[in-house]
């Protein structure tokens, strides 16, 4: 199975390149030949890569910056996703689109299911929703995988930021009134490969297509995640760091974040037989890897 992925520098693609299963070849497209900011480059690059399945993990992910350049976010996350899906349809191959919890407004009192109403409250969220809609309109043979609170040993993410701040501080303020599912990019990579295999091996099963939520088991506030990071760091000999639990209002940002980013992944488990691990164990492994590799 030849998996062609977009988003060369992103956490998910770096994780996929590390976790390639036997019998799978991963081709990661990169600029300048493939540039989501220039959507007309998308189809030619995908055609030349000769995929069995396309995974669009590339995205404009600067959530706050998107508020000041929404057109660019929409072009990258919306228009280019549609171009990729049209290319997949023309090639007759499945398309996997990676999406986000930010398509919801965060007001629901339980974890979001796939059929709950969407309502993004940021330019980034709106652009990702546009991407979902463009993919669904362009090809029936798709799976849209929504994930949330992604971290990994790669790139910029919450775990690496907390560890960096801990080097110079003994107390760090962290938001305690946003709740979600911290999800390792390594677990996401494994899930993507499983879904890709299902789509390619069982092309006539319509149930395998559509929207699926893909997050680790369990839930937490950002402050809980920070406390778990610092506890692991301290267990490895680091100095104690105290988490000051603050409200979202105490840490204003240009883009609004959903207060509830919890996603229900039951459908992914039921249909694709994919279940990501509990967030605590995966987080511990990530922190240990980062600290012991220094």
Kindly give the residue locations of the regions a language model identified.
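Active-site "gating" loop of Rossmann-like NAD(P)-dependent oxidoreductase/epimerase domains
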Residues: 63, 68, 101-121
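N-terminal Rossmann NAD(P)H-binding glycine-rich loop of SDR-like oxidoreductase domains
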Residues: 1-20
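NAD(P)H-binding glycine-rich loop region in Rossmannoid oxidoreductase-like domains
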Residues: 39-78
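NAD(P)-dependent short-chain dehydrogenase/reductase
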Residues: 136-181, 185-194
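Active-site Tyr-X1-5-Lys
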Residues: 119-143
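Mid/C-terminal beta-alpha module of Rossmann-like enzyme folds, strongest
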Residues: 191, 198-254
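Amphipathic terminal alpha-helices
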Residues: 277-294
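NAD(P)-cofactor binding segment of oxidoreductase domains
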Residues: 68-96
């Amino acid at each position: 199975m030849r998996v062609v992925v977009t988003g060369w520098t992103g956490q998910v693609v770096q994780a996929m390149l590390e976790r390639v299963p036997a019998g799978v070849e991963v081709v990661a497209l990169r600029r300048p030949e493939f540039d989501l900011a220039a959507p007309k480059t998308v189809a030619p690059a995908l055609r030349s890569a000769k995929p069995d399945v396309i995974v669009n993990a590339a995205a404009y992910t600067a959530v706050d910056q998107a508020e000041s350049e929404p057109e660019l976010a929409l072009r990258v996350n919306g228009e280019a996703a549609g171009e990729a899906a049209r290319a997949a349809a023309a090639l007759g191959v499945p398309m996997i689109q990676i999406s986000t919890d930010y398509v919801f407004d965060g007001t629901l009192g339980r974890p979001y299911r796939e059929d709950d109403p969407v309502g993004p409250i940021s330019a980034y969220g709106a652009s990702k929703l546009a991407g979902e809609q463009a993919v669904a309109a362009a090809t029936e043979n798709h799976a849209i995988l929504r994930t949330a609170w992604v971290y990994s040993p790669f790139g910029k993410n919450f775990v690496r930021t907390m560890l960096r701040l801990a080097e110079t501080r003994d107390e760090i303020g962290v938001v305690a009134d946003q709740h979600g599912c911290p999800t390792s990019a390594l677990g996401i990579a494994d899930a993507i490969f499983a879904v890709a295999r299902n789509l390619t091996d069982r092309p006539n099963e319509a149930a395998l297509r559509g929207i699926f939520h893909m997050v680790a088991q369990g839930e937490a506030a950002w402050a809980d995640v920070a406390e778990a990071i610092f506890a692991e760091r301290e267990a490895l000999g680091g100095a104690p760091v105290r988490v000051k639990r603050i409200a979202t209002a105490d840490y204003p940002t240009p883009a609004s974040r959903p207060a509830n980013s919890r996603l229900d992944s039951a459908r992914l488990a039921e249909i694709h037989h994919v279940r990501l691990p509990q967030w605590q164990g995966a987080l511990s492994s990530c922190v240990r890897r980062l600290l012991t590799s220094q």
